[in-house]
Amino acid sequence: MNIFGTRLKFTSFGESHGVAVGCIIDGMPAGVKFDEEFLQNELDKRKGGSKFATPRKESDKAQVLSGVFEGYTTGHPIAIVVFNENAHSKDYDNLKDLFRPAHADFTYFYKYAIRDHRGGGRSSARESVARVAGGAVAAMLLREFGICVQSGVFGVGTFVSNLKEEEFDFEFAKKSEIFCLDPKLESDFKNEILNARNSKDSVGAAVFTKVSGMLVGLGEVLYDKLDSKLAHALMGINAVKAVEIGEGINASKMRGSCNNDALKDGKFLSNHSGGILGGISNGENLILKTYFKPTPSIFAKQESIDKFGNNLEFELKGRHDPCVGVRGSVVASAMVRLVLADCLLLNTSANLNNLKNAYGLK
């Protein structure tokens, strides 16, 4: 499906080499200040063009078509479109019948019996433009509640930061070309990416997301837990293969006496849970880690088959990220924002008092 969310519904559309990509956000309350400069800044952060990303250069200028009047949301669907300006579709002519390893080519073809071979169509990282635009709109609502979502890269390939989570430098990441959270490892991360690119290869990355200013009570029990929604959102990003919340995998190695977050004087003494208990936020920072596989598009010679079953050896052309996880950090923030904004709106009917308050009743 191309629709995400319950009360705040996000729909993305468009393909890598189509006319445009974009999104529709339905359910945003009226009266939220619309920050078009912030929207554009988020899209600019996601853009390629550097030696650490795809050479494909797009202006990515957002056009807001509806849902905003005199600088504020109207309560009606917000439509945003970004036109594709720099697609080189001829680079993919030799791939029309070929299944690229680790791409969605094989599965898309066998599910739909048709696929857009130009840049991967919907499975391209280009689709994330829509996610970032939608996440930027969600952030405008979260601002009203003091909720801040930040992401950055803490690992590239075998290089992984050993800093404690509270030591990650988000101010440095804002200035870093690769959104690096550990100043001492930035050069190692960059060299790893460039070495992969120069070897006609690619490399994976690990992204850390922190949400501060959290409120108590976001999320539902059982099947709509906040952690379930966040994992769903992050795993839906192309190239993501794993997500951790709080201690994540480490929790399976711990004892309860260590993993439990004790309380004293109305405060939690630790945050092993990553800010979520029983599927509901407890007011502590949300802590998430998202792991991206190496970009499937590499320039080394590879083996595969075509749709007729013939064995083939081929080399890719085109423009591709040597490490898709770098720009993926911007996308991770966007998806977390969409989840939290949706949960905020769902809470208006979580209990009778909330519902009465929405109508000014006691």
Curated annotation (Swiss-Prot):
Its cofactor is FMNH2. One of its GO terms (cellular component) is cytosol. SUPFAM superfamilies: Chorismate synthase, AroC. It comes from the Bacteria. FMN binds at R122, S123, S124, N238, A239, G278, K293, P294, T295, P296, S297, R319. One of its GO terms (biological process) is amino acid biosynthetic process. Reduced FMN (FMNH(2)). The keyword Amino-acid biosynthesis applies. Pathway: Metabolic intermediate biosynthesis; chorismate biosynthesis; chorismate from D-erythrose 4-phosphate and phosphoenolpyruvate: step 7/7. NADP(+) binds at R46. Its EC number is 4.2.3.5. It catalyses: 5-O-(1-carboxyvinyl)-3-phosphoshikimate = chorismate + phosphate. Keywords: Amino-acid biosynthesis, Aromatic amino acid biosynthesis, FAD, Flavoprotein, FMN, Lyase, NADP. One of its GO terms (molecular function) is chorismate synthase activity. Homotetramer. This reaction introduces a second double bond into the aromatic ring system. Belongs to the chorismate synthase family. This is Chorismate synthase. It comes from Campylobacter jejuni subsp. doylei (strain ATCC BAA-1458 / RM4099 / 269.97). The lineage of its organism: Bacteria, Pseudomonadati, Campylobacterota, Epsilonproteobacteria, Campylobacterales. The gene is aroC.
